[in-house]
């Protein structure tokens, strides 16, 4: 498979991971809304710690591993249905499941604007990290570039959620995003050398608040 020139790869990543790409990411907080409600995240420092934990040892790390596995299987004609089923099984709550599956299906539909054989190899209902990873691989985009952009978009979406929840303002948000760049790059490097045996995590509080959010009385987000 021929790799895309870096300029084309950059343009595609900017389009696919833009807030304007129609996957509905603005509707999800990944449990952050409940963490704010419970006082676990209250300012820029606690928000940074929360998001770093997700990517180092929580759902963000698992998504990175699954992204890489999907990228590799897209490149070598591997079984994408298997990794898609695993990713779905790892969604630990009803709302986390909806968040990843609905965004994945929306991404698959929208990415049809860039025709590629990998689209037909993905199940119609597929976790977001698997869909993006496989389509990036199928389009010849370098793994670490694609995953770094995916992780930074993950940070960006949750920082935007934090703004709407009143935790940080615009200036603090941009400072946080700039500060997350080294973590996105180092995590992409680490995950690029991972296998499915590296799946796992210990961000249990994040998983608990994702479940608690299902019964939260007043809320802005779907997760």
Curated annotation (Swiss-Prot):
Q: What is its main location?
A: cytoplasm
In UniProt terms, what function does this protein have? Required for maturation of urease via the functional incorporation of the urease nickel metallocenter.
Concerning Gene3D superfamilies, the annotation shows: Urease accessory protein UreF (1.10.4190.10)
Q: Membrane-spanning residues where?
A: none
- Keywords on this record? Chaperone, Cytoplasm, Nickel insertion
Q: Signal peptide position in this chain?
A: none
The protein, known as:
Urease accessory protein UreF
Classification from the root reads: Bacteria, Pseudomonadati, Pseudomonadota, Alphaproteobacteria, Hyphomicrobiales
Keyword rRNA-binding on this protein? no
Q: Where in the cell is it found?
A: Cytoplasm
Q: Which Pfam families match?
A: UreF
Q: Which family does it belong to?
A: Belongs to the UreF family.
Assembly: UreD, UreF and UreG form a complex that acts as a GTP-hydrolysis-dependent molecular chaperone, activating the urease apoprotein by helping to assemble the nickel containing metallocenter of UreC. The UreE protein probably delivers the nickel.
Positions in coiled-coil regions: none
Instruction: State the source organism's domain of life.
Output: Bacteria
Which InterPro entries does this UniProt record tie to the protein? UreF (IPR002639), UreF_sf (IPR038277)
This protein's GO CC annotations: cytoplasm
> Listed GO molecular functions?
nickel cation binding
């Amino acid at each position: 498979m021929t790799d895309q020139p870096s300029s084309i790869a950059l343009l595609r990543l900017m389009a696919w991971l833009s807030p304007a790409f129609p996957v509905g990411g603005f509707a999800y907080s990944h449990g952050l809304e409940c963490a704010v409600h419970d006082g676990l995240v209250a300012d820029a420092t606690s928000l940074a710690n929360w998001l770093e934990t997700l990517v180092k040892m929580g759902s963000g790390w698992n998504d990175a591993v699954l992204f890489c596995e999907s990228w590799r299987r897209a490149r070598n004609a591997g079984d994408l249905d298997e990794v898609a089923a695993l990713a779905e099984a790892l969604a630990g709550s009803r709302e986390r499941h909806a968040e990843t599956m609905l965004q994945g299906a929306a991404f698959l539909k929208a990415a049809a604007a860039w025709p590629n054989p990998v689209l037909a190899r993905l199940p119609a209902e597929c976790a977001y990290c698997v869909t993006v990873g496989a389509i990036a691989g199928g389009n010849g985009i370098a793994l670490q570039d694609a995953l770094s952009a995916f992780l930074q978009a993950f940070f960006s979406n949750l920082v935007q959620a934090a703004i709407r929840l009143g935790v940080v303002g615009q200036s603090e948000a941009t400072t946080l995003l700039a500060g997350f760049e080294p973590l996105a790059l180092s995590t992409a490097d680490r995950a690029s050398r991972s296998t499915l045996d590296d799946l796992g995590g210990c961000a249990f509080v994040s998983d608990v608040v994702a479940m608690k959010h299902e019964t939260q009385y007043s809320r802005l987000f779907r997760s």
